[in-house]
Amino acid sequence: MQYVCSDIHGRYDKWCALLAALDLKPTDTLYVLGDVIDRGPDGIKVLQDMVQRLNVIPILGNHELDAALCIPKLLQEVTDESIAALSGKDFAALSEWLQNGGGPTLRGLQQISPTEREELLDYLRNMDLYAAVEAGGRTFVLTHAGLDHFEAEKPLENYELLDFLLGRPNPRDEIWHDKNKFLVYGHTPTRVLREQMGESPADTILRCGQQIAIDCACVFDGKLGCLCLDMLEEIYV
Protein backbone atom coordinates (compact mmCIF):
# COMPACT_ATOMS: atom_id res chain seq x y z
CA MET A 1 0.00 0.00 0.00
CA GLN A 2 1.03 3.59 -0.57
CA TYR A 3 0.17 6.24 2.00
CA VAL A 4 0.61 10.00 2.27
CA CYS A 5 0.57 12.46 5.18
CA SER A 6 1.88 15.99 5.75
CA ASP A 7 2.57 18.79 8.22
CA ILE A 8 3.56 16.76 11.27
CA HIS A 9 5.21 19.91 12.69
CA GLY A 10 7.15 18.30 15.49
CA ARG A 11 4.32 16.17 16.86
CA TYR A 12 6.36 13.03 17.51
CA ASP A 13 3.45 11.63 19.51
CA LYS A 14 1.17 11.88 16.47
CA TRP A 15 3.88 10.43 14.23
CA CYS A 16 4.29 7.38 16.47
CA ALA A 17 0.52 6.95 16.68
CA LEU A 18 0.25 7.03 12.89
CA LEU A 19 3.01 4.45 12.46
CA ALA A 20 1.22 2.19 14.92
CA ALA A 21 -2.08 2.64 13.10
CA LEU A 22 -0.59 1.91 9.68
CA ASP A 23 1.62 -1.00 10.78
CA LEU A 24 3.75 -0.47 7.67
CA LYS A 25 5.03 -3.55 5.89
CA PRO A 26 8.37 -3.54 4.02
CA THR A 27 6.40 -3.39 0.77
CA ASP A 28 4.40 -0.33 1.89
CA THR A 29 5.47 3.26 1.25
CA LEU A 30 4.61 6.36 3.27
CA TYR A 31 5.15 9.76 1.64
CA VAL A 32 5.50 12.71 4.02
CA LEU A 33 4.72 15.98 2.24
CA GLY A 34 6.93 18.36 4.15
CA ASP A 35 6.78 20.49 7.28
CA VAL A 36 7.93 17.66 9.50
CA ILE A 37 9.64 20.18 11.78
CA ASP A 38 9.00 23.52 13.57
CA ARG A 39 6.15 24.77 15.75
CA GLY A 40 5.72 21.49 17.65
CA PRO A 41 8.29 20.27 20.20
CA ASP A 42 9.94 17.23 18.62
CA GLY A 43 10.63 17.77 14.93
CA ILE A 44 14.21 16.54 15.28
CA LYS A 45 12.99 13.28 16.81
CA VAL A 46 10.57 12.80 13.91
CA LEU A 47 13.33 13.44 11.37
CA GLN A 48 15.71 11.06 13.13
CA ASP A 49 13.07 8.35 13.02
CA MET A 50 12.28 8.99 9.35
CA VAL A 51 15.96 8.75 8.41
CA GLN A 52 15.99 5.14 9.60
CA ARG A 53 12.96 4.10 7.53
CA LEU A 54 13.70 3.24 3.91
CA ASN A 55 10.00 3.09 3.03
CA VAL A 56 9.29 6.61 4.30
CA ILE A 57 9.80 9.12 1.48
CA PRO A 58 10.14 12.79 2.47
CA ILE A 59 9.01 15.65 0.23
CA LEU A 60 10.50 19.08 0.89
CA GLY A 61 8.36 21.64 2.72
CA ASN A 62 9.03 25.33 3.28
CA HIS A 63 10.03 24.67 6.90
CA GLU A 64 12.64 22.14 5.81
CA LEU A 65 14.00 24.65 3.30
CA ASP A 66 14.29 27.32 5.99
CA ALA A 67 16.10 24.89 8.28
CA ALA A 68 18.44 23.72 5.52
CA LEU A 69 19.47 27.34 4.89
CA CYS A 70 20.15 28.03 8.57
CA ILE A 71 21.63 24.78 9.89
CA PRO A 72 24.97 24.97 7.97
CA LYS A 73 25.81 28.18 9.82
CA LEU A 74 25.24 26.39 13.11
CA LEU A 75 26.70 22.96 12.37
CA GLN A 76 29.84 23.13 14.47
CA GLU A 77 28.11 24.12 17.68
CA VAL A 78 24.72 25.65 18.33
CA THR A 79 25.32 28.16 21.13
CA ASP A 80 24.31 31.68 22.01
CA GLU A 81 27.81 32.74 20.90
CA SER A 82 27.57 31.07 17.47
CA ILE A 83 24.20 32.70 16.89
CA ALA A 84 25.59 36.11 17.90
CA ALA A 85 28.46 35.68 15.41
CA LEU A 86 26.17 35.33 12.38
CA SER A 87 26.36 37.92 9.61
CA GLY A 88 23.47 40.33 9.11
CA LYS A 89 22.05 38.32 6.21
CA ASP A 90 22.40 35.02 8.03
CA PHE A 91 20.93 36.48 11.20
CA ALA A 92 17.93 37.78 9.22
CA ALA A 93 17.35 34.30 7.77
CA LEU A 94 17.63 32.74 11.22
CA SER A 95 15.24 35.32 12.69
CA GLU A 96 12.69 34.63 9.97
CA TRP A 97 12.95 30.89 10.62
CA LEU A 98 12.49 31.36 14.36
CA GLN A 99 9.50 33.64 13.83
CA ASN A 100 7.97 30.93 11.65
CA GLY A 101 8.20 28.34 14.40
CA GLY A 102 11.82 27.21 14.16
CA GLY A 103 12.58 27.61 17.88
CA PRO A 104 11.77 24.02 18.92
CA THR A 105 13.82 22.69 16.01
CA LEU A 106 16.80 24.86 16.96
CA ARG A 107 16.58 23.63 20.56
CA GLY A 108 16.43 20.06 19.28
CA LEU A 109 19.57 20.67 17.23
CA GLN A 110 21.37 21.89 20.36
CA GLN A 111 20.73 18.51 21.97
CA ILE A 112 22.39 16.36 19.27
CA SER A 113 25.98 16.04 18.09
CA PRO A 114 27.51 17.84 15.08
CA THR A 115 27.65 14.48 13.30
CA GLU A 116 23.94 13.94 13.87
CA ARG A 117 23.20 17.48 12.68
CA GLU A 118 25.20 16.82 9.51
CA GLU A 119 23.23 13.63 8.89
CA LEU A 120 19.93 15.50 9.20
CA LEU A 121 21.20 18.29 6.95
CA ASP A 122 22.05 15.74 4.26
CA TYR A 123 18.57 14.29 4.67
CA LEU A 124 16.99 17.72 4.20
CA ARG A 125 19.15 18.51 1.19
CA ASN A 126 18.15 15.29 -0.54
CA MET A 127 14.40 15.73 -0.18
CA ASP A 128 12.54 15.80 -3.49
CA LEU A 129 10.14 18.59 -4.45
CA TYR A 130 7.46 16.21 -5.66
CA ALA A 131 6.60 12.59 -6.36
CA ALA A 132 4.36 11.14 -9.06
CA VAL A 133 2.73 7.93 -7.90
CA GLU A 134 0.51 5.34 -9.56
CA ALA A 135 -1.94 3.65 -7.19
CA GLY A 136 -5.39 2.13 -7.50
CA GLY A 137 -5.55 2.89 -11.22
CA ARG A 138 -4.97 6.60 -10.59
CA THR A 139 -2.04 9.01 -10.86
CA PHE A 140 -1.18 11.18 -7.86
CA VAL A 141 1.18 14.15 -7.91
CA LEU A 142 2.40 14.75 -4.37
CA THR A 143 3.79 18.15 -3.33
CA HIS A 144 3.98 20.20 -0.17
CA ALA A 145 1.78 23.12 -1.21
CA GLY A 146 0.16 22.23 -4.50
CA LEU A 147 1.47 23.81 -7.71
CA ASP A 148 1.59 27.59 -7.83
CA HIS A 149 1.37 29.22 -11.29
CA PHE A 150 -0.34 26.06 -12.49
CA GLU A 151 -0.53 25.25 -16.20
CA ALA A 152 -2.15 22.01 -17.32
CA GLU A 153 0.49 21.21 -19.94
CA LYS A 154 3.49 22.38 -17.91
CA PRO A 155 5.94 19.59 -17.00
CA LEU A 156 6.57 19.27 -13.27
CA GLU A 157 10.29 19.82 -13.73
CA ASN A 158 9.60 23.27 -15.19
CA TYR A 159 8.03 24.67 -12.02
CA GLU A 160 10.09 26.92 -9.76
CA LEU A 161 11.16 25.88 -6.26
CA LEU A 162 8.67 28.10 -4.45
CA ASP A 163 5.81 26.93 -6.68
CA PHE A 164 6.00 23.65 -4.75
CA LEU A 165 6.49 25.18 -1.31
CA LEU A 166 4.33 28.29 -0.91
CA GLY A 167 1.26 27.79 -3.08
CA ARG A 168 -2.26 28.46 -1.82
CA PRO A 169 -4.44 26.50 -4.25
CA ASN A 170 -8.15 26.99 -4.74
CA PRO A 171 -9.46 23.44 -4.26
CA ARG A 172 -12.36 24.14 -6.61
CA ASP A 173 -10.09 24.83 -9.58
CA GLU A 174 -10.11 22.21 -12.29
CA ILE A 175 -6.59 21.23 -13.21
CA TRP A 176 -5.45 18.44 -15.52
CA HIS A 177 -7.53 17.21 -18.44
CA ASP A 178 -6.97 13.64 -17.25
CA LYS A 179 -9.68 13.26 -14.61
CA ASN A 180 -7.85 10.27 -13.18
CA LYS A 181 -4.92 12.47 -12.16
CA PHE A 182 -4.93 14.07 -8.71
CA LEU A 183 -2.89 16.70 -6.89
CA VAL A 184 -2.26 15.91 -3.22
CA TYR A 185 -0.79 18.56 -0.92
CA GLY A 186 -0.59 19.97 2.60
CA HIS A 187 0.69 23.38 3.79
CA THR A 188 -2.73 25.04 4.25
CA PRO A 189 -4.88 23.43 6.95
CA THR A 190 -8.09 22.02 5.56
CA ARG A 191 -10.07 23.95 8.19
CA VAL A 192 -8.80 27.15 6.52
CA LEU A 193 -9.59 25.91 3.02
CA ARG A 194 -13.11 24.97 4.06
CA GLU A 195 -13.71 28.40 5.58
CA GLN A 196 -12.48 30.02 2.36
CA MET A 197 -14.95 27.86 0.46
CA GLY A 198 -17.81 28.95 2.73
CA GLU A 199 -17.99 25.60 4.51
CA SER A 200 -17.84 24.74 8.19
CA PRO A 201 -14.25 24.15 9.32
CA ALA A 202 -13.25 20.55 9.97
CA ASP A 203 -9.88 18.92 10.53
CA THR A 204 -10.32 16.18 7.97
CA ILE A 205 -8.94 15.51 4.51
CA LEU A 206 -10.57 17.68 1.85
CA ARG A 207 -11.32 16.09 -1.52
CA CYS A 208 -12.53 18.47 -4.18
CA GLY A 209 -12.46 17.30 -7.78
CA GLN A 210 -8.86 16.47 -8.66
CA GLN A 211 -7.41 18.16 -5.59
CA ILE A 212 -6.85 16.47 -2.24
CA ALA A 213 -5.70 18.60 0.70
CA ILE A 214 -4.39 16.64 3.67
CA ASP A 215 -3.04 19.11 6.27
CA CYS A 216 -5.45 18.46 9.12
CA ALA A 217 -3.78 20.92 11.53
CA CYS A 218 -2.32 18.42 13.96
CA VAL A 219 -0.04 21.05 15.54
CA PHE A 220 -3.06 23.34 16.06
CA ASP A 221 -5.02 20.81 18.13
CA GLY A 222 -6.34 19.12 15.00
CA LYS A 223 -5.50 15.70 13.61
CA LEU A 224 -2.69 14.06 11.71
CA GLY A 225 -4.45 12.83 8.59
CA CYS A 226 -3.19 10.13 6.27
CA LEU A 227 -4.58 8.92 2.95
CA CYS A 228 -4.14 5.44 1.52
CA LEU A 229 -3.69 6.14 -2.18
CA ASP A 230 -4.62 2.62 -3.25
CA MET A 231 -8.02 2.57 -1.54
CA LEU A 232 -8.58 6.31 -0.85
CA GLU A 233 -9.09 5.34 2.77
CA GLU A 234 -8.57 8.09 5.35
CA ILE A 235 -6.72 7.44 8.62
CA TYR A 236 -6.57 9.90 11.54
CA VAL A 237 -4.66 10.00 14.81
How would you label these PLM feature ranges?
Residues 1-49:
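N-terminal active-site segment of His-dependent metallophosphoesterases
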Residues 7, 35, 50, 61-62, ...:
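Divalent metal-coordination and catalytic microenvironments
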Residues 5, 32-33, 59, 142, ...:
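Generic enzyme active-site microenvironment
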